[in-house]
């Protein structure tokens, strides 16, 4: 039996993180598209890792539980890397909320029930969660603590209160951050830690969809006018995840780390600020 990592989302960011911290472990790779999971599994196995692909639908509690049970058949779950999700250009409002918001909440909840003492998790949200106007304290608390099966019934998540897919995505990512804070308290009762990384524009297939989508010029302008002057890479996100998931990050839990090359800073206080 081995320590087991659950990696959800067979993409560049998830793989980069798993390669940093997953050596010596069994890595169960879950993705909505089995061919994606198989591709990442093959690449990692050929590099000496021990992985297996699995089909998983993040919007389904049943699918999430099945993935966790599969992982437990190899040993205790000691790490979670959640890099699954959809983008504003890929999905309608309802799907964004069901996958990115509800699905992430369920995953953190279910893994939190079984995570090994000393275990650690990281979930990938987005800088988008930082771009919205502040919610009320009550709305933030509801996003953090409402029972998962009641999340999508919250008033602020009803269709008439959501402008477009970007707004839905922002709400989902804000919820991810709040949910990590609340769930980290429960994980802590098991002696485990949980954190969130909110990347900016990182070059991945998902980002390339955005660059070529209806908001492509917006995103290209964003990294052209942020302090870093460029998009990020998956390895740069993995740099931070490696810290958070190592013993050097032992005092870090319930936190969100914004890694966006300064784009959010420029949005509020620089050339990316919206015109009045």
Locate predicted features.
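Conserved glycine-rich Rossmann-like NAD(P)H-binding loop of the short-chain dehydrogenase/reductase
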Residues: 23-39
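Catalytic loop of short-chain dehydrogenase/reductase
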Residues: 85-90, 117-190, 199-204
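Rossmann-fold cofactor-recognition segment
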Residues: 44-62
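A conserved structural motif in NAD(P)-dependent oxidoreductases
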Residues: 226-237, 248
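A glycine/serine/threonine-rich, flexible loop-to-helix segment
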Residues: 135-146, 202-225, 266-276
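Short, small/polar-rich loop/turn modules that mediate ligand/substrate recognition or access, typified
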Residues: 193, 252-254
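Canonical Rossmann dinucleotide-binding motif of NAD(H)/NADP(H)-dependent dehydrogenases/reductases
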Residues: 1-28
């Amino acid at each position: 039996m081995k320590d087991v990592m659950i990696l959800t989302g067979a993409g560049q960011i998830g793989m980069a993180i798993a390669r940093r911290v997953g050596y010596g472990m069994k890595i169960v790779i879950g993705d909505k598209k089995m061919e994606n999971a198989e591709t990442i599994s093959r690449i990692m196995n050929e590099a000496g890792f021990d992985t297996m692909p699995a089909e998983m639908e993040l919007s389904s509690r049943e699918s999430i539980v099945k993935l966790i049970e599969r992982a437990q058949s190899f040993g205790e779950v000691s790490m979670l890397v959640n890099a699954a999700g959809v983008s504003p250009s890929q999905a309608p409002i309802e799907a964004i909320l069901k996958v990115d918001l509800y699905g992430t909440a369920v995953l953190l909840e279910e893994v939190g029930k079984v995570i090994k003492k000393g275990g650690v998790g990281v979930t990938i949200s987005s800088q988008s969660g930082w771009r919205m106007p502040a919610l009320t304290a009550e709305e933030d608390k509801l996003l953090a603590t409402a029972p998962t099966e009641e999340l999508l019934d919250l008033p602020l998540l009803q269709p008439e209160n959501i402008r477009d897919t970007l707004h839905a995505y922002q709400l989902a990512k804000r919820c991810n951050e709040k949910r990590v804070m609340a769930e980290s308290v429960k994980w802590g009762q098991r002696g485990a830690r949980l954190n969130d990384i909110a990347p900016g524009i990182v070059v991945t297939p998902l980002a390339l969809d955005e660059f070529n989508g209806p908001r492509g010029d917006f995103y290209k302008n964003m990294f052209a006018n942020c302090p870093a002057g460029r998009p990020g890479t998956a390895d740069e996100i993995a740099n931070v995840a490696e810290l958070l998931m190592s013993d050097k990050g032992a005092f870090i839990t319930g936190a969100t780390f914004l890694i966006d090359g300064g784009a959010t800073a420029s949005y509020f206080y620089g050339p990316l600020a919206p015109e009045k």
